[in-house]
A protein has these predicted regions:
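Active-site metal-binding motif and surrounding structural segment of the metallo-beta-lactamase
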Residues: 34-49
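Active-site microenvironment of metallo-dependent hydrolases
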Residues: 1-21, 25-26, 60, 73-111, ...
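Divalent-metal coordination cores built from histidine and acidic residues
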Residues: 54-201, 535
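Histidine/acidic residue-rich metal-binding segments in metalloenzymes
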Residues: 157-181, 185-370
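Histidine-centered catalytic micro-motifs
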Residues: 50-61, 228-236
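Active-site neighborhood of phospho(di)ester-bond hydrolases with catalytic His/Asp-centered motifs
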Residues: 48-55, 113-115, 260-261, 295-296, ...
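A solvent-exposed, charged loop/short amphipathic helix patch at secondary-structure junctions
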Residues: 70-90, 192-203, 313-339, 394-412
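Flexible loop/turn segments at secondary-structure boundaries
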Residues: 59, 120-122, 145-149, 184-188, ...
Length: 541
């Protein structure tokens, strides 16, 4: 049992905004009161629900591929040494599994979502997640280029496609469905892309990106998954792609959806020489679409590693930069591309990208619908989130940083005109309460009775960067695991998954297809439940 007393509590899900009150914990949950137990004096401190990262890339074959491609990053990274319970690890843009858990927890985050998992490599992903300590986890399954599903959409068999998607979710032991460049990764196997949402993709006569998007959104809603379709739009990173992004949002009208790393989809112009921010245009449209949530995918200057299933984009990035390039096909399901990248403040495109992420966070007026991410490790490392929080809470600090950018870049953005400053309550929403709600994780992101006892306690510091960089305490499931940045305990986190209803007869349809087109047998394909660390099945309702 534990009582936290004297701290200013920010619990926006329960309309608590800086109120000094006690938080009581027993058996890993928030309770109304406790008798006895430890008392934690949080006077002069700020109490938040534990952070929730709705979109990150921290485990699986793609991360291992990236680690192998960038040994120079591992050499430069600060090592995490073995100490007591703590295992050794390496940080940097693609931290090792143990380091990932320590770095998230050391910053005050307690739940993370691995946003891109193919079924074929899901066993690898789950085993790495099992090695990622402290934080709770969930996964999104890559689906918008899975040829088992696309073939059924081509044949207008939407009901059977739904059963296949449901079976694949159950087989992969995941929480949600992810659509990456719908149709574009399939087209990449032919050396092409899917830039026009209305044109059939390569290898099909009727299946378009628009059809894939609308069908998957329908399937996710009909399966009643707690998290809506999680979508990475077509034409990521391209000048003028704001048109595609808004077209995608129009296709999704009437359906739930989460728009991933929106910064990479908010550009105007028609080539790299005149690329400009269209964050204001996109935010204005997004504000009217109450069916949508989004995460920012903000960038920060410095080294990154771009990792995505969006193979055609990665090839273009390789051509633009001349950096190392890795490309993989994941059989009939998806692909993978890796390119190391450095964002530079004196680069006009990078300067605009930096501004766009902040502009979206400031111009989208409802913090319950836009969340803090960097699409780790694509835009910046997740452990740099406090830098972004500092930029959001201080207009003066933003203006100081803007002075370091090229004058031509300033003409292509609106950030200098934005005076909005986030409050602590709004920060609590975009890093915890909002993403938890969008994920449908009802015990996360708040400090109400019955919530998981995931609590972060910060020093109340006017310097937001220093405040959020190192919490005073992190409490995970009722146990103090981090104190002043030091890992005290290393509990194993849970993994959330869903098991939507599925017609068992769908296996009769799938088994012969596997024998014909897969290198893995049908019986070896599903992930066994005993590979999952502390699985917790969430209801589909």
């Amino acid at each position: 049992m534990l009582r936290i007393t004297g701290g200013k509590v920010y619990d926006p899900a329960n309309n608590i905004n800086g109120v000094v009150k006690d938080i009581c914990i027993a058996d890993g949950r928030i309770v109304a009161d406790v008798e006895g137990g430890r008392i934690l004096n949080a006077t002069g401190m700020v109490v938040f629900p534990g952070g929730v990262d709705i979109h990150t890339h921290v485990a699986g074959a793609a991360l291992n591929f990236a680690r192998g491609m960038t040994p120079e990053n591992q050499r430069r990274a600060v090592p995490i040494l073995h100490k007591g319970e703590r295992r050794a690890g390496i940080g940097g843009p693609t931290p090792t599994t143990y380091a990932t858990g320590y770095l998230y927890a050391g910053m005050g985050w307690t739940t993370v979502v691995e946003a891109a998992v193919p079924v074929l490599t899901a066993k690898h992903t789950h085993e790495e997640l099992r090695d990622t300590p402290i934080v709770d986890k969930a996964c999104c399954l890559l689906m918008a280029n899975n040829e088992l599903v696309l073939d059924l959409l081509e044949a207008e068999e939407i009901e059977r496609a739904k059963q296949v998607v449901s079976w694949l979710i159950r087989a992969a032991k995941v929480y949600g469905v992810k659509a990456v460049n719908p149709g574009g990764v399939t087209a990449w196997k032919w050396g092409k892309d899917a830039k026009n949402l209305a044109e059939p993709i390569e290898g099909y006569s009727k299946t378009t990106p628009a059809k894939i998007i609308s069908s998957l959104a329908q399937i996710v809603d009909e399966l009643r998954l707690p998290h809506p379709l999680h979508i990475h739009c077509n034409n990521l990173g391209a000048p003028g792609n704001v048109v595609t992004t808004i077209e995608t949002m129009k296709i999704l009208e009437g359906r739930r959806a989460h728009m991933a790393h929106l910064q990479f989809h908010a550009y105007g112009g028609d080539d790299w020489h005149n690329l400009r921010s269209e964050a204001a245009t996109l935010a204005d449209y997004f504000n009217s679409q109450l069916n949508l949530t989004a995460d920012a995918g903000a960038i920060l200057f410095g080294d990154a590693v771009t990792i995505t299933a969006d193979g055609p984009w990665q090839h273009l990035l390789y051509q633009l930069t001349g950096r190392k390039w890795g490309n993989l096909d994941v059989e009939n399901e998806t692909g993978c591309g890796i390119v190391p990248y450095t964002y530079r403040p004196n680069n006009l495109v990078n300067a605009v990208q930096w501004a766009v992420g902040l502009e979206l966070l400031l111009l989208i007026n409802d913090p319950w619908r836009i969340f803090l991410t960097t699409d780790h490790p694509n835009g910046a490392c997740f452990w740099r989130y406090p830098e972004i929080i500092n930029l959001l809470t201080s207009a003066e600090f933003r203006r100081e940083r803007l002075k370091r950018l090229p004058a031509k870049a300033l003409e292509r953005m609106t950030l200098m005109d934005l005076d909005r400053e986030y409050t602590l309550s709004e920060i609590a929403i975009i890093i915890s309460a909002g993403p938890a709600r969008a994920l449908g994780l009802t015990r996360k992101g708040h400090l109400g009775i019955g919530a998981d006892a995931d609590v972060t306690i910060y020093h109340d510091n006017p310097d937001a960067y220093q405040m959020f960089k190192v919490p005073r305490y992190l409490i995970k499931a009722g146990e103090i695991v981090v104190e002043e940045g030091d890992i005290r305990h290393m509990p194993e986190g849970r993994e959330f998954l869903v098991q939507p209803p599925c017609d068992e007869k769908i296996e009769e349809y799938l088994r012969p297809i596997f024998q014909q087109v897969y290198t893995m047998s049908f019986d070896n394909y599903p992930v066994e439940m005993d590979r999952i660390a502390k699985p917790e099945i969430q209801n589909c309702k």
